[in-house]
Swiss-Prot record:
Protein's name according to its UniProt entry: Cytidylate kinase
HAMAP family: Cytidyl_kinase_type1
Enzyme class: transferase
Keyword Transmembrane: no
Reaction(s) this enzyme catalyzes, per UniProt: CMP + ATP = CDP + ADP; dCMP + ATP = dCDP + ADP
Entries under InterPro entries matching the protein: Cytidylate_kin, Cytidylate_kinase_dom, P-loop_NTPase
Gene3D superfamilies: P-loop containing nucleotide triphosphate hydrolases
GO BP terms: pyrimidine nucleotide metabolic process
Binding site for ATP: G21, P22, A23, A24, S25, G26, K27, G28, T29
Gene Ontology CC annotations of this record: cytoplasm
SUPFAM superfamilies registered for this protein in UniProt: P-loop containing nucleoside triphosphate hydrolases
UniProt entry keywords in alphabetical sequence: ATP-binding, Cytoplasm, Kinase, Nucleotide-binding, Transferase
Amino acid sequence: MVDLKTKAFDFAKNFAIALDGPAASGKGTIGLILAKKFSLQYFQSSIVYRQLAFDCINQKIDVTDMDAVIALSKALKLDSHLDLEHESIGDMASQIAVISEVRNNLNKYLINLVKTTPRIIMEGRDIGTVVVPEADLKIFITANPQIRAERRYKQLQAKGKKCILDEILRQIILRDKRDKERKAAPLLPASDALIIDTSELSAMEVVEEVTNYIKNKIA
């Protein structure tokens, strides 16, 4: 873990947190709690990729038709009423995310959002390394694949959605491989990120660690 004791925070002014990590590592739960605790607007960057995946499926555009996918990414419009959590959408979003032109187009949307939002926590895969490298605080959340699959399985079951644990684990391992090996912004922590392995930690324990870290910086 990188020692960031030399970096001081002025939390009273504009503040941006970049929260990165692999699929189902607990970023969303942790991000929402931190956003509420520190009065930050929370935004999940994967929504733009899932929206694009949904649009491709809806318009019967195959992920291999790169020109069509890229064109669609230039005119993306978010629909907050859609349920974009289905695993098939997440899997296609992961395939779309390896297209560098798509990432460039969607990153423009994300960068503009950060610039126009004074206090924000943005969650994703490359927020601290690409989208907001100047973020006041960068956090990288990770956990082993089996635990992440079990967490996702419980989340989906709680929402009444049918799912198979082994299939979720298979997709998580596949997404990890895509995320880490893609040429455009591979998944990795920023050099100055606070790295937390949540395999044996609850969401509240992680929030407490981050909270103490922030308090030490603004003390």
